[in-house]
Amino acid sequence: KTMQEQGHFSSYIYRGLKGTLYEGGHRVPFIVKWPKIIKDSIETDYLTCTTDFIATVAHLFDDILPENIGEDSVSFLPVLLGEDKNDIDRGGIVHHSDAGFFAIRKGKWKLIFDENAGSRRVDPKDKPLINPGEIQLFNMQTDAIESTNVAAQNIDIVEDLKKLMAKFINEGRSTVGKSQKNDPTPKGWKNVSHFESYLKIN
């Protein structure tokens, strides 16, 4: 609170705080120093997640992960080696809030399955959201500060992301491979009602 009073906000320009589904709770810089391999300075906006570390390390050592290990992990080693990849190549990433709510990100789109971004925490610097709603869709290329919910204008995108979220749950993974079981069952998960029609829950 004292830092905020002095004009310092830990989430910088981004909406939300740690624990929320907004960028202020998830977006962090990732810095790699590897002098023998990375000779020149490289800066990229390639989308990655902490879940990707296990696949990246396995890739580095030419190891193959078992089907039930790293089900949501994608290697970003090619990016470190200078290969030009984009967010679509990464596939979808599922975000999780401190209160158990979900969001999904694929490419430039991010869909939050909760009107309060999955948390009671509020950043006092944030301006009111334009077009609030039970679900929130943001174009992260043009609105990384998540100022405007564009779900109503992009119904097809919303449905596609709902289907993708359900697919990940149905298959127990967000990467290519043998389907895995979820533990516990999705029946008790929050937000499921938003995409329940696409789920295959016994």
List where the protein language model places each region.
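Short beta-strand-to-turn element immediately C-terminal to the catalytic PLP-Schiff-base lysine
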Residues: 31-33
